[in-house]
Amino acid sequence: YYTYLICKKFNLDYFSASRAAMLHDFFLYDWHEPRKVNSFKELHAFAHPKIALQNSLKNFELNDLEKDIIVKHMWPLTIKFPKYIESYIVTFVDKYCATVEFFKYLNKRYNLKMVYRYAYIFLTVLFVRF
């Protein structure tokens, strides 16, 4: 939803960006389950964008923007830079949502209100400096 809102606000291709955002983790396996990995390129973080693209192509017709978003949403792990502004938006929204989910998990598990306060102060100082 954030991708849609941001892309719509900046008059970008919100339809393709939203569609790709919904398909970017379309890998159809439980990544929590242990599996044999022969190299670091087979680790979930590196492999799932390509698997998600393959699964998406089997089920839907995608344009170049959607393909780029799906394959490069794990940047900088994917090394290649995203080609489109919408790709960067999905990448950063994905990272933002993952961070929020992580802190919700920590808060639920450990009741870490102080962690939020220090994280807020740290991020504020970090962004104000640059």
Regions found by a protein language model. Name each.
Residues 1-130:
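Metal-dependent phosphohydrolase cores
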